[in-house]
């Protein structure tokens, strides 16, 4: 599967994941949402929940988070979370 987005997930202490992905699902403050290639630029806060993403190899991974924020720009998704 061809990767279409770059993802970096970090906490205040360390980089938790950095990879190429096809999609990511995030626990938005108002409602969960999914980011695909070509998503509009956005910065928003995250609630507690799961960050779920699919790598270019087709593996689906997830990470439980307490809170955080995400910046989406030019097919790059930067997520800063509190675990």
Name each model-derived stretch.
Residues 2-83:
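Compact, glycine-rich, soluble single-domain proteins
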């Amino acid at each position: 599967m061809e990767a279409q987005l770059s993802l970096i997930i970090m906490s205040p202490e360390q980089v938790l994941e950095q990879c190429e992905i096809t999609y990511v699902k995030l626990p938005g403050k108002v409602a969960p949402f999914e980011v695909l290639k070509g998503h509009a630029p956005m910065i928003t806060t995250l609630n507690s929940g799961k960050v779920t993403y699919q790598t270019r190899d087709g593996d689906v991974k997830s990470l439980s988070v307490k809170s955080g924020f995400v910046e989406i720009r030019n097919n790059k998704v930067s997520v800063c979370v509190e675990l």
